[in-house]
């Protein structure tokens, strides 16, 4: 899903190598897993203290409850880093996008049970959620096969929602006039502010979630499908995703949805060209 859910109701809120020392498990204490780039540290941030540990990636907070596996939290951190520094040269590919994420105090929360999301988030922050059990660090390394890694989706949603939509409102803004929305209208077979009972037969993006609103959700979902298809993440998933998204390869996106393809490959925006695998600078 596109955003953090409280009791599964959609909302968007406007809302580093460490020692091998292991703390005793418990609230506010963390079992550390070694990573060459990122540290897991205890967390007590206001409004998010129920998530007892976190990793900071280029200033972006990634939180997790204690039941979330450390390796999966670190995987999410590495995917975040690879999306933002796709060539892994140590420099952010699009500083404006990161600046907007920082302005919006963007954050990711990782949960084990849905009840972990029954929290009151600081209103000035924009957040995203990711489940422990939907995180599969081996998906990309196994040739984009097996159970899909939701990290590729949820981390990208956060970057697009808190970053691109603010950095480039004319292109990626969550509004009816943005280039993203115009391309999406073609992909859906029309401009539907309410979910249609049946999408037109010529639509290639058909998202039926009634909680997913046109501007704040449908646009972000559409961007995710298009970019990850260009990057190769969906190439083996057509049978799984075809009812929602039909253009599961880069060639299909380029040849069928040239509007979004040109937008996402425009060098001005410097979108990723390599699918993250969770091994940033390893």
Regions found by a protein language model. Name each.
Residues 5-14:
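Sec-dependent signal peptide recognition
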Residues 23-58:
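N-terminal low-complexity, Pro/Thr/Ser-rich intrinsically disordered segments
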Residues 57-197:
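Acidic/His-rich structured neighborhood in mature extracellular/periplasmic domains
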Residues 64-71, 143-147, 208-220, 244-252:
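Conserved aromatic-histidine-acidic binding/catalytic patches
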Residues 170-171, 177-234:
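Domain-level detector of nuclease and nuclease-like folds
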Residues 216, 220-282:
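Pan-zinc metallopeptidase signature
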């Amino acid at each position: 899903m596109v955003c953090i859910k409280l009791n599964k109701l959609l909302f968007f809120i406007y809302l580093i190598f460490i020692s091998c020392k292991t703390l005793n498990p418990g609230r506010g204490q963390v079992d550390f897993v070694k990573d060459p780039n990122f540290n897991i540290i205890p967390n007590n941030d206001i409004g998010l203290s129920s998530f007892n540990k976190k990793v900071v990636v280029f200033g972006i907070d990634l939180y997790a409850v204690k039941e979330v596996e450390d390796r999966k939290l670190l995987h999410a951190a590495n995917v975040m880093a690879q999306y933002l520094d796709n060539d892994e040269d140590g420099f952010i590919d699009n500083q404006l996008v990161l600046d907007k994420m920082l302005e919006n105090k963007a954050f990711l929360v990782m949960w084990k049970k849905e009840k972990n999301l029954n929290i009151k988030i600081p209103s000035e922050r924009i957040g995203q959620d990711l489940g422990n059990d939907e995180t599969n660090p081996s998906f990309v390394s196994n040739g984009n096969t097996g159970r899909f890694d939701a990290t590729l989706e949820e981390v990208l949603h956060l970057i697009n929602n808190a970053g691109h939509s603010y950095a480039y409102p004319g292109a990626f803004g969550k509004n009816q006039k943005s280039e993203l929305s115009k391309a999406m209208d073609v992909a859906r077979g029309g401009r539907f502010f309410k979910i249609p009972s049946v999408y037109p037969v010529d639509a290639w993006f058909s998202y039926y979630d009634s909680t997913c609103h046109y501007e704040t959700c449908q646009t972000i979902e559409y961007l995710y499908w298009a970019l990850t298809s260009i990057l190769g993440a969906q190439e083996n998933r057509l049978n799984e995703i075809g009812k929602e998204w039909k253009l599961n390869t880069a060639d299909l996106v380029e040849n069928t949805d040239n509007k979004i393809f040109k937008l996402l490959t425009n060098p001005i925006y410097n979108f990723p060209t390599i699918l993250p695998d969770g091994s940033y600078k390893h």
